[in-house]
Amino acid sequence: MVQLKAEIDAGPLDNSISIFSLIENGLRQKPDAPAVICLHESADALDHLIVPSNPRERERGPADGECLMLSYRQLHHTAVKLAVGFRAKGVAPGSTLLMLVPNGGHYALLLWACILARLTFISVDPAEVLDDLKSQRIASILQETRPEVVVIPSVIEAKAMDGILGATSITELLKISLKKVQEPGWERMTKLVSDGIANPLDMDALVEEARCDDPDRLYSIMFTSGTSERPKGCPLRVGGAAHMVRSWSWLINQINSSYALQQAHNSRGIAPAQTVQTWAEGGAVVMTGRGFDVDDMLDAIRLNYASFVVLTPAMAHALAAHLETHQIDMSSVKTVQVGGDAVTKNVLVKCNSLFPHADVCINHGMTEGGACFEWSFLDIAPSDVPFFGQICPVGKTARGAAVRIWDTEREEIAERGRPGQLHLSSESIIRHYLHGESAGSFYQQGGQRWFITGDIAMMTDEGTVYILGRSKDTIVSDGHLVMPFVIESCLEDLTGSQASVIAIPHPVYGQVPYAVLQTLKQVDDHAIQDQVVRLLGTDYQLAGINSLEALGMTTVPVNDTRKIIKSQIKEAVMRYIDGK
């Protein structure tokens, strides 16, 4: 019998369109519908920038007048003035803008203006400017990207940025502040909009140029989280960003885009992608002020301002705990996207029970790009999804992408059903890291550009793909590859408790897996270890099981995007073992 190879090319995707042409759909279809709703900003927060709409023209929302709400018409007209203001200051198409701004109305205006003015945008969390350790990263970004424009929130960040700039060789820079700043050399964003109003530049010509944007122009540079290594710059082309929007039309659509809740900060790749995807469908981007915060999400749901939400597994667990003591109507939520970390069957089923009226799906994405998989299980119950043990699939190969599982031992495409390195090819994936860093992560073959993701994955005979974990997280125990996520999903199924598995050193086997559970109450750790071996085999024998409490931790440590920080868990485990 001939074994199928684990590679699928799903064929081309029509992508002959610019980013502005995509978001212009919302402007044309619903000019007076809300494009941006900021629950954490007052209704008059941008009155100094925005020309108020006629209240009879603008569609009203559940909390109209209580928070900032911009219509497509308001957003576009103001962004045009801002784009012209940039041009009046000598900022030409192809220039780079570094924005360090919180989620909110200013971010939305800057993003729309960058698309109109054809500027490359870089987003960084403004808190990093004020952090002595992270400010070094800002200096590196400035030196590596040489932006023509930098935008910060207020005087505090302006002073810090001046200090950082003083340590670089950058001298020519347009410095913009969202609020009034007395520091020399800084201009308020309001002044740029005023300059745009007074400038005779043909605004219609600017819009037409945006419609015909060069697909090879650099659209954005986002930086990887740097959880385990130095952050790498990911330069995404206009054509790649447009490809992502076209491919994700199954994810955010006319049905669920009315109020698409965006909690990730705009420095995370998921945020601008979701913003543009929502605008392309004529929906409203709903923003909150505290990142992936469960309370903020629930506030949005109570106000009926959340038809589309994004959850990480850690958030799903926190939300479930909250809803045990609080009753909230979740019927306004139409779609729940789960991702950010590996997703188990329990998490998917739990999300379905938390949001009984919603479609629950997984969407795979990376800072380097996305749109390589399509969730093909929307028409079936989450419990009937074809799981691999307790592991959820990421879907099947999406149109416009090719997926390959690579056998590193044999140096060939793996057979289906066998794990290997996940390699992806798509227009939506960057062609290289900034300045050619980690060049070995990319290769050219058969007329296609491939990206080595760093994930270990498996493809079934039906073409369904499962990501088993990160290559860097793989535990090599006595010469055998052990995937922590496989054990974590098994433990969560057996105990109902959130689990994290890390590697600890062993004098004979090199490494062995060690598990940390949210709680060990009503758990027989020895019996659980025996069950893990019985279900997964002797390669998965645990060196021990412990609870967060025993390690001196109260909660699972997560980063800004709610991904678990395993390095902190490992440090706590090693302290515990050394102290015994």
UniProtKB/Swiss-Prot annotation:
Pathway: Secondary metabolite biosynthesis. GO terms for biological process: fatty acid metabolic process. It comes from the Eukaryota. Keywords: ATP-binding, Ligase, Nucleotide-binding. Its EC number is 6.2.1.-. The keyword ATP-binding applies. Induction: The expression of the dibenzodioxocinones biosynthesis cluster is positively regulated by the transcription factor dibT. InterPro entries: AMP-bd_C_sf, AMP-dep_synth/lig_dom, ANL_N_sf. GO terms for molecular function: ATP binding; medium-chain fatty acid-CoA ligase activity. Belongs to the ATP-dependent AMP-binding enzyme family. Acyl--CoA ligase; part of the gene cluster that mediates the biosynthesis of dibenzodioxocinones such as pestalotiollide B, a novel class of inhibitors against cholesterol ester transfer protein (CEPT). The biosynthesis initiates from condensation of acetate and malonate units catalyzed by the non-reducing PKS pks8/GME11356. Pks8/GME11356 lacks a thioesterase (TE) domain, which is important to the cyclizing of the third ring of atrochrysone carboxylic acid, and the esterase GME11355 might play the role of TE and catalyzes the cyclization reaction of the C ring. This is Acyl--CoA ligase GME11374.
